[in-house]
């Protein structure tokens, strides 16, 4: 979708292409789409006043907007069409019902740790839910070999909100 750096977009596209050739399919939780839409709408609202964020984080959506000459209206359009783009262009499968993972995540160790570092409990719950989903798909197995892993959770792991150690969980 090219809302990060050109290098990141190229890396993501390569990851998608290679993964497809290896037979992987792509699945996204409905909650993930909603999180992305909320982020895009926030960025759209603040686009005209985002001077500092652009200079602090070169991977911020604001810099992609400058590079691609996107307006607030463009970001709103991207947000409105996000699910359709993921399904029809990128061929992702959407999991619409996530209550089972949401319930498990709410009482998980991960949620209690992540909520200390995320801006909202909703964002922390989403992250914990994704971890619970992957753990269930993997069958609680530890990764031994890259090629034998049946489920990956891919995200942009760089966060400028707060720094915390992944080894906590």
Where are these regions (language model features)?
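Active-site-proximal, substrate-binding regions of enzyme catalytic domains
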Residues: 2-151, 159-169
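Catalytic binding pocket for nucleotide-activated donors in carbohydrate/polymer assembly enzymes
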Residues: 154
């Amino acid at each position: 979708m090219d809302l990060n750096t050109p290098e990141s977009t190229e890396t993501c596209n390569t990851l998608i292409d290679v993964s497809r050739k290896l037979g992987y399919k792509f699945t996204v939780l409905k909650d993930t789409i909603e999180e992305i839409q909320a982020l895009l709408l926030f960025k759209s609202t603040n686009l005209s006043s985002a001077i500092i964020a652009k200079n602090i984080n070169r991977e911020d959506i604001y810099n992609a907007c400058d590079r691609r000459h996107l307006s607030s209206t463009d970001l709103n359009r991207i947000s409105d069409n996000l699910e359709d783009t993921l399904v029809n262009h990128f061929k992702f499968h959407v999991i619409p019902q996530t209550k089972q993972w949401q319930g498990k995540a709410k009482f998980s160790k991960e949620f209690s740790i992540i909520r200390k570092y995320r801006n909202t409990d909703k964002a922390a719950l989403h992250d914990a839910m994704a971890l619970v989903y992957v753990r269930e798909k993997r069958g609680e197995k530890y990764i031994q070999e890259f090629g034998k892993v049946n489920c990956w959770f891919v995200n942009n792991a760089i966060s400028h909100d707060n720094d915390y150690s992944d080894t906590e969980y």
